[in-house]
């Protein structure tokens, strides 16, 4: 659930113009209006402590930019430059540049884990349902017997994921510091963005190369599919709690009896 909450707050870069940096000005803004336009309070501070002026301006959204609610005005720190930015940040959680940078990467990795998780839930259950596989429910997979005990599996998983996550964290703190292959040092990556390592291991088909418009389109699709996957995993979890069966079994039951096998049946008295 935390990943779903995080996905709704990530969007773009902080509001900063070259002129404001050149004049040493600090731009303070009010919270974004949840729906419509708003007025922003802009305070400019000069390099001398005695010279101070304040002005009020109106910020208009780009009419061609897709927004989460048509006609709404996005907050200034969401300028549409990041993939999946539709101007949605009613709580202002992305207003701080450092928080935005961290939350952007947090959403990205949660999206990817959720897509893997959704595939691990739906595909084996569907193949088991039609008789191709014979796998346990995802909800009880941790109770099964494996080639070793679960404690050993957990420790091995913790070490491997900890190493990978440590390198990812280092790349966030200092971009480009992990672009050299730790096993084959002659293999180096250049021109990559944080969160998108590319190369043979992470982009074997070369989809991450091309025009900026194409790259942003693919990254936006990844974010949108990841957000949907986070909702799907959360939905499958709640579904199993209330029905005791998986999503594919629930789907087949609904198709067999659409008038009675619905979401409301879980809350109706037996």
From Swiss-Prot:
FT transit peptide: 1-42
Chain sites annotated for binding chlorophyll a 2: 110
Top-level division of the source organism's lineage: Eukaryota
Entry binding sites for chlorophyll a 6: 254
Binding locations of chlorophyll b 3: 165
One family name in Pfam for this protein: Chloroa_b-bind
Primary localization class, coarse: plastid
Record-listed chlorophyll a 5 binding positions: 221, 239
Transmembrane segments: 113-133, 146-166, 228-248
Positions annotated to bind chlorophyll a 4: 225
Residues that coordinate or bind chlorophyll b 2: 112, 155
Record's subcellular location: Plastid, Chloroplast thylakoid membrane
Quaternary structure and interacting proteins, as annotated: The LHC complex consists of chlorophyll a-b binding proteins.
Family label: Belongs to the light-harvesting chlorophyll a/b-binding (LHC) protein family.
Domain remarks: The N-terminus of the protein extends into the stroma where it is involved with adhesion of granal membranes and post-translational modifications; both are believed to mediate the distribution of excitation energy between photosystems I and II.
Protein name: Chlorophyll a-b binding protein 7, chloroplastic
Organism: Solanum lycopersicum
Gene that this polypeptide is encoded by: CAB7
């Amino acid at each position: 659930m935390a990943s779903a909450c995080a996905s709704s707050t990530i969007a773009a870069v902080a509001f900063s113009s070259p002129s404001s940096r050149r004049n040493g000005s600090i731009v303070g803004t009010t919270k974004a209006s949840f729906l419509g336009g708003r007025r922003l309070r802009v305070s400019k501070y000069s390099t001398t402590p005695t010279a101070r002026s304040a002005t009020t301006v109106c910020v208009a959204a780009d009419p061609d930019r897709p927004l989460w609610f048509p006609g709404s005005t996005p907050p200034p720190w969401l300028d549409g430059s990041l993939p999946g930015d539709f101007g949605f940040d009613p709580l202002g959680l992305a207003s701080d540049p450092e928080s935005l940078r961290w939350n952007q990467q947090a959403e990205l990795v949660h999206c990817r884990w959720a897509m893997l998780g959704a595939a691990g839930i739906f595909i084996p259950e569907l193949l088991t349902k039609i008789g191709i596989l014979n796998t346990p429910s995802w909800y009880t997979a941790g109770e099964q017997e494996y080639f070793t005990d679960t404690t050993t599996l957990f420790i091995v998983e913790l070490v491997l994921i900890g190493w990978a996550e440590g390198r990812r964290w280092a790349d966030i703190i200092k971009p480009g510091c992990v672009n050299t292959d730790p096993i084959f040092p002659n293999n180096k990556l250049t021109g990559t963005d944080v969160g998108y390592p590319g190369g043979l291991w992470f982009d074997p088909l070369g989809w991450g190369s091309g025009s900026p418009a194409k790259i942003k389109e693919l990254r936006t699709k990844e974010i949108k599919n990841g957000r949907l996957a986070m909702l799907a995993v959360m939905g499958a979890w709640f579904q199993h709690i209330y029905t005791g069966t998986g999503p594919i079994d629930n789907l087949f039951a609904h198709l067999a009896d659409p008038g009675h096998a619905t979401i409301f049946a879980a809350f109706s008295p037996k």
